[in-house]
Each structure stands twice: as C-alpha cells, then as structure tokens.
Amino acid sequence: MDRRAFLFQSFAATAQALASARHTLAGTSDGPAKHRFPNILMKTHENRQVRFYDDLVKGKHIVLNFMYASCPDSCPLQTANLALVQKILGPRVGQDIFMYSVTLDPTHDTPDVLKEYSARFGIQPGWEFLTGAPDDIDLLRRKVGFVKRDPVLDRDKSQHIGMVLYGNESLDRWAACPALSRAANIAEYVMWMEARTTKPAVGAVEQGTASRPA
C-alpha cells in the first residue's frame, strides 16, 4: 500500500475514535499548533514534571497511546507490542521520535506505579509513561480525539485504549492505527510522518535499522 492510500485509510478506519479531533488536528487553518494540544501539567514515570505541549509535543515527532496499569488484558498486550516498535525504531526513540503512554486512571497510577509497570516491559529511554490530574487527563483524551458519543461508553476506560496516535507536530501531520497492528508496520507508519524524499524500506524497518529521513 502506498503512503497516500495508507494515510487516507488510516483516518477512515479511525473515524469514530478521532471524530472530535479531525478539524483540530488536520490543518493549519484553526490557529497555532499550541492551541490544539492542552498544555497540561503532567508527571512522568520518573517523577519529572512536564507540560504536555511545551515539553512533549512542540516541534516533535511523537507516538501517543492511552493505557492504565490495572487493565487486565488489552493494555499489557498493547504495551508489549509497542515495546517491539521501540526496539525496531532503535536509538531514534528519545532522539527524534518520542513515545508517550498516558494513564486513564491517574488516581491509581502514580509515577511509582507507572515506573513499575514500564519496568515489566523493559521500556527504554525515550518512552514516557504519564499521569496527571483526572480532569486534565480527560481534557487531553478529548482534545486528541479519543471520544465516544455515547456518554456511558465514553466513561469506560477500556473504550479508549485500542489506538495509537502518531504524528509530526512541526509538519502538522497526523494519523492513527490499532495498537495491536504488526509492530514493523506501526514503525513504518510512524516514519511516514517525516519530511523525507523516499519512503522507508519495509525490510529495513523489519530488521530494526530505521534511519533518519533521506
């Protein structure tokens, strides 16, 4: 599948999950990028205080998903799969690609809880697990489009953990895919968000030799 076709299908397939974020994330006509992402105060699993937009998103190439430590099945599978993505992307994670997992249970998921959770999966530097005030987390979730129209479903944390949002803030380029997609495919899709003249080779992604844009 070529890049243009994939990007189209990616947005089509995630219409429900990203419905409220489409015009927010899709172009430059809505104003500066900083107004599209809440600049909420958060803490990382290393207990470092950060601002979501200023410190984590502005000018960066990111991968973002939602999770919670007490999730019994889906979250561990998704985290393990994304750990494979991190391995494939290699040293680029933390240098020019940044991975973020935001808890949907901030009351329980303190930095210490998230640190223990990340250690279970051998998470390497460049991937931050984030918590914050419940209202702020809810605002972030909604702003990036993880919303259900049915208010009962929207209150169910398990309804918001199946997708990965990825993009390049400096280019205002965004897409999403299922968190349990093949890890090599996710890594390839992430690299499609770059300003490059050639598409990343699937074989290179498979072998974990992802390179910077040509």
Language model features with spans:
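N-proximal helix/coil linker or "cap" segments that precede and/or mark the start of modular domains
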Residues: A15-N39
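Conserved helix-turn-beta segment immediately C-terminal to the redox Cys motif
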Residues: T79-Y100
